[in-house]
């Protein structure tokens, strides 16, 4: 018997997979004026959309402070 293939009584262990916990509260976007948390796209089915105030075009109004929120590419035009 070859001694290189036998592990003299040691059991082989499986490595546990590394897990990382992602805190969803930290990556939520906030309003630049009042720092209130905005709805994430993944939460859109869980939230009532009655409070969203749409202005003209792609501009939204923050429900907490009323400031206008628009996409960054709208500032270039």
From Swiss-Prot:
Higher taxonomy: Viruses, Varidnaviria, Bamfordvirae, Nucleocytoviricota, Pokkesviricetes
Family membership noted in the UniProt record: Belongs to the orthopoxvirus OPG146 family.
Organism the protein comes from: Vaccinia virus (strain Western Reserve) (VACV)
Matching Pfam families: DUF678
Subunit-structure text: Interacts with capping enzyme RAP94/OPG109, the two large RNA polymerase subunits RPO147/OPG105 and RPO132/OPG151, the two early transcription factor subunits OPG185 and OPG133, one of the capping enzyme subunits OPG113, the nucleoside triphosphate phosphohydrolase OPG123, two core proteins OPG129 and OPG138, and a virion protein OPG064.
Classification via InterPro entries: Poxvirus_A19
Protein name as annotated: Protein OPG146
Position of the signal peptide: none
Purpose of the protein: Plays a role in the maturation of immature virions to infectious particles. May also participate in viral transcription.
Subcellular location: Virion; Host cytoplasm; Host nucleus
GO terms (BP aspect): viral transcription; virion assembly
Cellular component GO terms held in the UniProt record: host cell cytoplasm; host cell nucleus; virion component
